[in-house]
């Protein structure tokens, strides 16, 4: 996995963010979701590195990134977005392109709202805006995304149950989607399991979700009350066999908060980069390349 990529641990915003870096062209930041790490991109990373300097990062609380103690704002998407902008600046990229999945796409949404000048364009995978998803939650969504409501329970109950059976937790979250466990290589699954077992990961995951059900909604409602919109081009893709497209209208919801939105469904489930890597590359590569003259290209 990740041929010719370099591993780095970069200090920024008071934490260390783990990442892999590969390629020698304009900058592309890749962000993963729950309960995974940057390894979700392993099927597309080498191709992307032919066109970009790819930075595949672990979010705070996940993978080999720091997992700070939970406080009110520690795992807000505002803080997590600042981590990633700081990472890119430390690497020499003031402006860059983003592709992000699941929780990483929620971080990318906040990044685009708070640091619009840094983001040239974004591809977001299998989410609708967090506020829309909470406000439109119904029985179908709650049953399918049970973990949203399990992980926000007060500590230490969810953390204790995850630690008691991390393999079972991963299989219950990842293996019950459209493609089952067949979407994940043994090597990738072993890496997800290793990282879930690290001290602080279960807490980081839970605090990520607790923030989304709390302070992140406050920030999103503030943006809505101010009429704040995302100005950069967005490509929105979701799994044809997943929950997001069944329970929400992704393009309509993103058009409520952003000015330039296009995209559609791909023939897969939730874990797009692992289930349908070639379809993802075909759908996103031209968009991600865009006007490459605007993208920084230095690496320190």
Locations of the language-model features?
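Short, well-ordered alpha-helices that flank and scaffold nucleotide-derived cofactor binding pockets
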Residues: 43-46, 50, 113-117, 282, ...
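Conserved HGGG/HGGXW glycine-rich cap/lid loop of the alpha/beta-hydrolase fold
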Residues: 15, 20-67
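Structured beta->alpha junctions
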Residues: 23, 33, 100, 269-272
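Generic C-terminal helix-cap and adjacent flexible tail
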Residues: 286-300
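Proline-centered flexible-loop/turn and helix-kink motifs
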Residues: 35, 50, 116-117, 259, ...
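Catalytic histidine-centered segment of alpha/beta-hydrolase-like enzymes
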Residues: 269-281
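Flexible "cap/lid" subdomain of the alpha/beta-hydrolase fold that forms the substrate-access gate
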Residues: 2-8, 15-17, 27, 55, ...
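Conserved strand-to-helix beginnings and helix N-cap segments that scaffold or border functional pockets
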Residues: 41-42, 247-248, 277-278
């Amino acid at each position: 996995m990740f041929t010719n990529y370099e591993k780095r641990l970069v200090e920024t915003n008071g934490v260390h963010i783990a990442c892999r870096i590969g390629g020698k062209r304009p900058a592309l930041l890749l962000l993963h979701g729950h309960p995974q790490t940057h390894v979700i991109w392993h099927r597309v990373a080498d191709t992307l590195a032919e066109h970009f300097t790819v930075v595949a990062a672990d979010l705070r609380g996940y993978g080999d990134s720091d997992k700070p103690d939970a406080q009110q704002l520690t795992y807000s998407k505002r803080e997590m977005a600042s981590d990633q902008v700081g990472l890119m600046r430390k690497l020499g990229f003031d402006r860059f392109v983003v592709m992000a999945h699941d929780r990483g796409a929620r971080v990318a949404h906040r990044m685009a709202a708070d640091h619009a000048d840094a983001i040239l364009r974004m591809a977001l995978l299998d989410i609708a805006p967090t506020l829309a998803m909470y406000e439109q939650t119904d029985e179908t969504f709650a049953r399918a995304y049970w973990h949203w409501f399990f992980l926000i329970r007060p500590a230490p109950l969810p953390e204790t149950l995850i630690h008691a059976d991390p393999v079972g937790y991963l299989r219950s979250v990842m293996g019950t989607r459209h493609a089952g466990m067949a979407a994940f290589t043994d090597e990738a699954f072993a890496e997800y399991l290793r990282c879930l077992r690290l001290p602080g990961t279960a807490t980081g995951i839970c605090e990520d979700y607790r923030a989304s059900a709390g302070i992140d909604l406050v920030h999103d409602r503030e943006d809505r009350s101010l009429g704040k919109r995302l100005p950069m081009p967005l490509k929105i893709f979701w799994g044809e066999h997943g929950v997001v497209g069944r329970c929400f209208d992704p393009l309509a919801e993103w058009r409520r908060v952003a000015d330039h939105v296009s995209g559609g469904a791909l023939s897969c489930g939730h874990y797009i980069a692992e289930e349908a890597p070639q379809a993802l590359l075909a759908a996103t590569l031209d968009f991600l390349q865009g006007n490459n003259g605007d993208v920084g290209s230095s690496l320190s």
